[in-house]
Amino acid sequence: AYEISECLVGSEMCRRDRLKRNRTLSPEELRLLLTDAAPEEREYLHRAAREVARVHFGNGVFVRGLIEISNYCRNDCRYCGIRRSNRLAERYRLTPETVLACCEEGYRLGFRTFVLQSGEDPALNDELLTGLIREMRRRWPDCAITLSLGERTEASYRALFEAGANRYLLRHETITPDHYRWLHPVRMSLDHRIECLHTLKKIGYQTGTGIMVGSPGQTVDDLVRDLLFIREFEPQMIGIGPFIPHRDTPFGHEPAGSVERTLTLLSILRLMRPAALIPSTTALATLSGDGRMRGILAGANVVMPNLSPPDERSKYNLYDGKAAFGAEAAEGLAALERELNEIGRHISWSRGDYQE
């Protein structure tokens, strides 16, 4: 058992150090960390998470080339700008040839991981996707292929894995059933989403999950449950970003989530899962000009510049004001490198696979 004689039981210092040592805290202690932490305690937390990330990954930050292949979606999530019933969304779907051209450019720039992201588009069937993945694997055998395509059948996940995909991102968003029902349409089920996550792990994917911070109806207790679920599930990747409203959704007038709370959660998750691959998200950069670097300084170790065709980027509009150009874009790599250098980091061009 962790020896706590050097600090007062329940004190801030003890709480932080126990989290770093034991990789978990009690629900009540996590709650206090999220609600009562003074600015200096949050900074200590970020510093501890930063050091853990540095021990595991050095000063390198992995880059992934993000390609948003379709903004069609069969779902009607109440927070999402590409929800099915948003008739104002300008829809697009990239051809396999366009996706391959994006990968070609990304490979030339130095990317060795590609992330294919999409709404749950019924047109992206297994035949199309397996053909695309096989061709990517044939042309760039040294690259990792990450998918973020939503909920699919076990047979589909297996076919995509066997075609050559390595990783799969599927954020659960919230582990609280009532909150999940508030955010999502009736046809979507939290149980099914969690089942998908376990299926992905069973098949052999490096699996990622995560949460949206500050979504309408979310409580601190919901966040504590999310932290404990992630701790128990042990994902290889963790995606966490603030809720940002989209004007053409039922939640269009709700306030955005807190950058500070997102950074606190990011640091907690780094201490819980020291070797996890944790991106500093575009949503952080959208809400705060220095948000992406603040995410790195809170323990993140991945960034995902946008490789999508510039004409389509603004159409993959999950929320208002999305940062998709400048240092957020693949063509802004020099700016990204400068920003990282200013905080003592640099781009790592390796595949960046998960390693315990």
Task: Please give the residue ranges for each predicted region.
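Active-site-proximal loop/turn and secondary-structure-junction residues that shape catalytic pockets
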Residues: 67-69, 120-122, 149-153, 174-176, ...
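Conserved, mostly hydrophobic/aromatic
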Residues: 49, 77, 116, 170, ...
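Canonical Radical SAM [4Fe-4S] cluster-binding loop centered on the CxxxCxxC motif
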Residues: 57-58, 62-97
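Generic structural signal for well-ordered alpha-helices
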Residues: 65, 103, 130-134, 157, ...
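Core AdoMet radical
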Residues: 84-99, 106-127, 132-197, 206-213, ...
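Catalytic cores of alpha/beta
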Residues: 153-160, 216-229, 285-297
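Auxiliary Fe-S-binding modules of radical SAM enzymes
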Residues: 11-40, 107, 231-356
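Short, small-residue-biased leader/transition segments that mark boundaries at the very start
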Residues: 1-14
